[in-house]
UniProtKB/Swiss-Prot annotation:
HAMAP family: GrpE
UniProt feature, compositional bias: Polar residues: 38-53
Protein name: Protein GrpE
Molecular-function annotations in GO: adenyl-nucleotide exchange factor activity; protein homodimerization activity; protein-folding chaperone binding; unfolded protein binding
Amino acid sequence: MDDKQKTNEEVKASSFDSEKSSKNQAFENTEEPAEGFQNVQHDNGSNPAQKQNSEAKEASKDQTNTNNNELSKKLEQLETERLTLQEKIAVLEQQHRELEEFLLKMKHEFALAKEALKRDQEKKERLLAESMARDLFPILDTLDHALEHDGENNGLRLIRSQLVSVLEKYGVVEVGKEGEVFDPNWHEFLGYAEGPENKIIKVVRKGYKIGDTLLRPALVVIGKESSC
């Protein structure tokens, strides 16, 4: 082989090696993007799911915090309302006690007023009866004297009986009857006469009373046993 042929073959071999090297380099370059693509697919395939899961957890946590805050506010509101109701109840209870005390006081005052009115009415009635009785005493005395001289006069007896009935209606009753024991609280001593010791022998003038109030004592003669 001459030098010229050898040189051509070396050039061809070098060209073939260069072409082969270029192809291998191109192949390697095409494989690297594929690996990068796989990495992109791996990143794009796994990270969104993790991100979504993380976002869901964060949203759930935020919702829980929101619910807890709302619950706390609601509890605070309920506690405030409870305290307000307790204050209102305390005020109402105090007002109730004051009202009970007021009603009890009014009831007591009403009872006192009623009793005072009753006593006042009784006093007025008694004073009226006393005044009326004193006005009738002279008439009764006149009738009694007339009946001493004319005991058979039924007309006079009827008039006297009617007057006594009117007095009794107002609580006025006679005191001092023959045969009773002398009582200085109701009787006025005029003298002695022979008879049972300390007994009323004669009623000179009748006495009258209302209850325990003496309007006029009875004038009486009491008995005294003879010393002989």
